[in-house]
Amino acid sequence: MQAKSKTESRAEYCTGYSEDVDVIREREYPFLKDTTYLDHAGTTLYPKSLIDSFARDLTSNLFGNPHSRSSSSQLSTQRIDDIRLRALRFFNADPDEFDLVFVANATAAIKLVVDVFRDSSPQGFWYGYFIDAHTSLVGAREIAERGHRCFLTSGEVERWIADLATDQKNFPRLFAYPGQSNLNGRRSPMQWCKKIRDGSSGAGNVYTLLDAASLVSTSPLDLSDASAAPDFTALSFYKIFGFPDLGALIVRKSAAGIIKKRKFFGGGTVDMVLAQGMPWHAKKSTIHECLEDGTLPFHNIIALDSALSTHGRLFGSMSNVSFHTRYLAKRLHNRLAAMTHFNGQKVCHLYMSPESDFDNSTQGPIIAFNIRNSSGAWIGKSEVERLANVKKIHIRSGSHCNSGGTATSLGWTGPELLRNFSAGLRCGDDHDVMDGRPTGILRVSLGAVSNLRDIDAFARFIDEFYIEKEPEFVSLVPPMEVVLQEPSFYVESLSVYPIKSCGAFKVPDGQRWEIKREGLAWDREWCLIHQGTGAALSMKKYPRMALIRPVIDLERGVLRITCGSDSKELEVSLRREITNLVTTSLCQSAKSSNVCGDRVVVQAYSSPTVASFFSNFLGVPCTLARFPPQISTRISNPTRSSRRSQRALMPGSFPEDPSPTSEQPPILLSNESPILLISRSSVNRLNENIKYNPRPSYSTPAKAVEADVFRANIVVAENLHQLANAERPYIEDTWESFSVGPEQLCFDVLGSCQRCQMVCVDPYTGTRREEPYSTLVKTRKINSKIVFGRHTSLSNMELSQGAGKPKSCTVMVGDVVTPQIA
């Protein structure tokens, strides 16, 4: 493709739209205020006027079940017929040549085709698919009894097509491919369908299935030439319009013969059926009538009418959307490709097919990439996505349900992926880098309503947080001579978190608090579980959990709980009670440690009063559960640095986390370790960094954060009058162990605490904000991990005395802390 001039390319920006895209956004997409949405390949967004139009339609008309004969039912049937025709015309599909079957989504359309082929022949069918296929296309191979093949390159497909003319196989064959990769936007040749049809004209048993879900989101699908069109086209309307949640299967009527062999039939698809005696039925005559099982989602179909009208009014045509998004995608791609660190190392590794050049036939508005630091090390995709989320930038990371494209882009082989799976890699987890290679890919995708500000915001985000503009020699610990001074630390505060992810109970001054091998007494002994899934709730997903505040009343033997400003109070006995046992997972998705994703047995409180107390406050069906005493405790696994050990510390260096011991300490419902420690001096230094962290002129000034956002059990502080007011932030990074109190209780340091965006939840308001995570990313990134605080546990030597006799261990606010430096 010849290069276009800058003026000519700029003319593509929102050309043909009813108004400037910024004006459309302000009026039609109020939820985009202060938000950068770059996940249009997941779903594009619905305009306000679409919802208003649909609401008017529903409130002005009475729509009945289309299978009835009443006037309301006939109205529904009439509207469905009209909208079916309108949808076909949207894709330039002649209703004499094509029929459209309404389904739930593109995956449902694919499954419907596969079901048809499964029943088409006693011999079964053969299935071929392209490497860029979505998981839903790959899954069809499991039903292909005559075998299957994954085509790795376009050349392989072309050679297979060339051989069809001499192929005498007489069983049905189906070739499926995506019109556009949902991973990187690579577009496959549309002419394959015609080539396959022409090449197999003698046999007439080779069919094509086009997954158009990603393609149609920003590009016109032209089916005007029925001879060149796919036999089956699967798509989702929400990818185009944002709403309704509805899909379609477009079928060439010349392929209707194989459809008639489908065995299953549902309500509304037959003219008559005998329920007893002879198993006989007569299917309806049209393609859509015999494939649309049961009552159609007629309200969603009616909403499609409003979607088509609104989209046309705002954007004119899909060609306009295509030009607009192509301009933006090329602009963003070029900016990311040009980014370099101070030493010339590229910041972004872009995964774009060599065959793609942002021509409409080869590339869609999707950019797939990963980020490297100045030394070439990969930045974890999860960290980037978490930080983007904090900055209100919506992107996606992972394999994107496109395992073939991801593996090919990253250079993973099948055996290597199986080894990764055995090592714990799962879809959606935080295993970002294994064997020195990324396990997933970052993706930004553009849509009709994307604008230049979206591009600029994302480019600024990468520039601010991931471009190293000069060599950094950040002193993470004080100079050597300061480290060697006689330390003078004390316990400033003790916090117990009885309910996982909820508020803290502050241990009163002057009260000694029992500490066990699994942590402070009563810490993380309870959790809230979803009554439907059994998964433990997390503040990451439900920030209002921070406002659930427990108080441990040892005198009365109860846990008193309040929620926000509500005066209602719930009391739960500290004594063990018999409750229903349920199995639950600590997180809904697997994490890099062995904590989140563990299946643990907890005792769920069966009282409706308990369940409603928490459910009403959080707005989610949940109840309280407790870690039972008879069940073995879990094993801690704190995040560890990958640095080699170095006993002799140089100024400005960061020490190796202690090597794992042969026996890891147990934990209850804590995420990674029995006890978490932070220092007041480190919090103060972080707040100084937050204050002086450069910010865009339009952003609000950042506020200092409280130590409570880090949810530490122990906060240590320094006696500054003994040190001439010389605070030593992050000196705890050098600690190998420490002792506390008059009895010199010994604690082992297990490693550094890796941080996520949970620290952005204000513990007093339950609201999310950017800090401190945004500043931590800049100042506390160690080996591509954002760390703050230290995981600790009571030393094994403190757990018994004499002949295995239990030893009582306690700590108190004000106790002296004596560290042992690594």
UniProtKB/Swiss-Prot annotation:
EC number: 2.8.1.9
Record: active site: 401
Pathways per UniProt: Cofactor biosynthesis; molybdopterin biosynthesis
Ranges for domain MOSC: 643-820
UniProt-annotated stretches for the region Disordered: 633-666
Function: Sulfurates the molybdenum cofactor. Sulfation of molybdenum is essential for xanthine dehydrogenase (XDH) and aldehyde oxidase (ADO) enzymes in which molybdenum cofactor is liganded by 1 oxygen and 1 sulfur atom in active form.
Protein name: Molybdenum cofactor sulfurase
Gene: hxB
